[in-house]
Amino acid sequence: MTIKREMRNDKRAAPKAPINENISAREVRLIGADGEQVGIVSIDEALRIADEAKLDLVEISADAVPPVCKVMDYGKHLFEKKKQANEAKKNQKQIQIKEIKFRPGTEDGDYQVKLRNLVRFLTDGDKAKISLRFRGREMAHQELGMELLKRVEADLAEYGTVEQHPKMEGRQLMMVIAPKKKK
C-alpha cells in the first residue's frame, strides 16, 4: 500500500491577511487609500469603496472590535514587505570567531605579526580566539603561556575586551576576545 503525501515547500508561507470577500466581519473600521479614517462601515460599503478605487480591501487588525481594514493595492503591499525583509537581512552582520595560534616560545617578530592580525579581526567586528599549544615538556612551564596571554590581553585592551579568560583545555591554553562596541 502506498501513502500519498503532499509536496511541501521548505519555506512556510506566512499567514496572509484576509482580503476583499474573504473578510468575515459584518462591520469594519475603514481606513481609506490615502490613510484617512473613514469610520465604521458595513463590509458591503467597504468593498464598494475599494472597488471604486480599483484597489483591495485588506484586513489589517483582526483582533480589534470591529476589525480594522484598509483600502490598498495588496500586491504592492506584499512586494514592499518582502523588500523590507530582504533589506533587513542584508544589513545583518555575521560575527565570526577567528583563531590565532601561539606557542610558548613565539619570538617578538612573529608576535607582532599575529598581534597585527588580531587587531584587524577585532576592528572588522569579529571575535578573536587565541590558543597557545604546549608540546612535550613545555607543559611544565604553563606560567610562560599565561604571561604571553596576559601580554596579548594588555596589547589588545583598546581594541577589545576579554570574553573568556585564559583556561586550559587539554594541552592548549585558550582565551577569547570580543571587539569593543562602537559608539
Curated annotation (Swiss-Prot):
The keyword S-adenosyl-L-methionine does not apply. The keyword Cytoplasm applies. It is found in: Cytoplasm. Disulfide bonds: none annotated. It comes from the Bacteria. One of its GO terms (cellular component) is cytosol. Monomer. This is Translation initiation factor IF-3. It comes from Pseudomonas putida (strain W619).
